[in-house]
Amino acid sequence: MRKWLIPCAAVLLCTLVLALCGAAYADEAENITGSCTVKLCSKNFKAAKITDGLYTSYWESDKTTHPWITVSSKDPIYGLYLCFQKMPEHYQVQREKSGGEWETLYEGDTRFHHMYYPIDGYKHLRVYVPDKGKTTMGFNEIFAFGEGEIPDWVQQWKPVPEKTEMLFLATHPDDDILFLGSVIAWYGIEKQRNITVAYLTKSNTTRRSEALNGLWELGIRTYPVFGEFRDVYANPNRISQAYKETGGKDKVQGWVTELYRRLKPEVVVTQDLEGEYGHPQHKMVADAACTAFELAADAGKYPDSLALYGTWEVKKLYIHLYGTPREQVEFDWTVPLDSLGGETPNERAADAYAMHKTQVGQGRKSNGVFTPFSVEEFGVKRYPNNIFGLYATRVGPDIGHDDMLENIEGIEE
C-alpha cells in the first residue's frame, strides 16, 4: 500500500497547485468594455473611438454645459478606467439609482489623466461635469471591468512628490525611453530611488497617453510632469530659433528653473547637448537644464517660482553622452535583473518603447537609408544610453564612474 502513497500524494499536490494557479488567473478582472453600451452627450464622434484600445483615436464633446458620457452593462461593473483626452477642471463619477436619479460616487481626481475608479457592481455609470458654464470633456480610451483583481496594465499613479531624489528631464514623450529609459529603470526600479520624469512638451494628447503607458510598462509608478510647450522642429544649427519657436528662452528656462525649485532633486539627468541625432529641441532642453543649474539657486531670478518654492541647489547634473571618460559614468544595461522579471534594462526599455504606437515606424533618413526609431538602434548603437557625463557638480567629481548618486549625502540604499 505504501508504494501508492507517494504517487497519489504527488498527484494530489499537482492537482492542488494547478487549481490554485487556475484560481489566480481567474481572479483577474475581465475587461467587459466590448459588451458595454457607451453613450455620448454630443454626436460628433462615434463611441467606438474610445473603446477600441488604441489611444490614437478619441472623442471630445462640443463645448457645452454639463458634458457627460454613460457606460451601461448587462453585467455588474467593478472598475472604471478613464484615459482623458480633455480633462475638465471638475468632474464626477456617478451611478444611476433605481428611480433614474444619479448618485455621485467620486469627485473626479484631476491629478492624473489616466485614472482608475473601483465600482461596487453597478450597471449604469456616468462621468459628468456639474459646473455651470460651457466646457469640454474628452477621452482617448475608457475601460470597464468585471469582478476580480485589476490587470497590471491599469494605471494607479502615485502623485508627483514634493521632493525627489532624481529628476529625468526629457524633451518629448519617447525621448525618455529611447535615451534615458534604461537608467530610469535602473534607479527607479532596481535601486528603488525616488525619481520623477518630466517632459518639456506632451506633443499632443495621444502622445501624453503613450508617455503614461510607456512609463507604466517601464515600471515607474510616480506620475510625471508635463510642460505645456509646443513640439516644434527648428533649424538644428540654431538653439536660439528653437527657443523662439518653443515660446521664448525666458519661458523655457523659467519653467526648468521652477521644476528644479519645485521638485528639489539632488541629481538631474537630461539629454545630449548635441541633440542626439541633432534635434533642436533636444539641444534646447539640455541647454536649459545647464542654465537652470545656476538660475534655480539664484534668489534674484524668477521671483514667481522663488515665492512658491524658494531657491534650490541641484547637487549634480548629468548630460547624455557629455564629456570624456574622466567626467562620465558608464553602465552595463545587458545584465538581467530580478527586479525587472529577468529582463535587462535595455529589454525593459524596448518593451516600454512599444507603447509609443505613433512613434513606432517613425525614424531618420541618413545617406538615403531610412532607419526606424528603436531602443536597440538609437538608444544602444547610435547614441549609447549607458553613457552620461557629469556636466556640473556641487559635491565634487565622481571617483567610481558607475553611480550618479555618488557623493550625495543623506540617501540610503
Features from the language model and the residues they span:
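Active-site beta-strand->loop->alpha-helix modules in alpha/beta enzyme cores, enriched
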Residues: T65-P67, K86-E89, K97-Y302
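The feature marks non-catalytic terminal segments
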Residues: D27, T33-Y58, K158, L295-E413
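Bacterial N-terminal signal peptides
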Residues: A9-A19
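Positively charged n-region of N-terminal signal peptides that target proteins for export
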Residues: M1-W4
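Disordered, acidic Ser/Thr/Pro-rich linker "stalks" and the adjacent N-terminal cap
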Residues: A24-I77, Q85-Y91, R95-W102, E107-G108, ...
